[in-house]
Amino acid sequence: MEQVDWARMTGPPWYLPEAARAAMERLARSVADQQAARALADLRCAVTNDHAGTLYPAAVPATDVFLQAIGERPGPPRQEALDALLDWWGWSPEEGSETYEDPLTGSVGLAEGLMGRVRDAADMLRRVADDPSGGGGHRPGAKLLLARLDEGWSQAAG
């Protein structure tokens, strides 16, 4: 996983980059699935306003973390990551935080940045959607995320 400089990202006053960094450190150290799922949940809370249904710019690189968990961490971490991305689909950017400054490509809208990362991971998501391991409980979520990608970003989706 590429190192993310969470402190470099802009956001509202209640965006706490140190919480995102701490969640990533816990995820890297996690051995048990429940530890990894909790770290992913903490990352989700660090990069969004869950109560208002709004995204901070840090949600864009966090999407890569969730996609990596979907691809590599079956069980509770995979489900936590799928749930986060499905919940975010259609959310609005936090007012005043509508763009993400990508260090490689420049400024991008949050929805566009998030969708681009999911689009780039579509092959992996198809494999996960077809994977019956662990009882296959993750399959509907992976299929729904792919369907949402095909439908585009919509306030009604989230």
What are these regions (language model features)?
Residues 12-14, 51-56, 92-100, 107-115, ...:
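Flexible loop/turn segments at the boundaries of HEAT repeats in alpha-solenoid HEAT proteins
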Residues 1-2, 34-47, 85, 92-102:
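HEAT-repeat alpha-solenoid elements in large eukaryotic scaffold proteins
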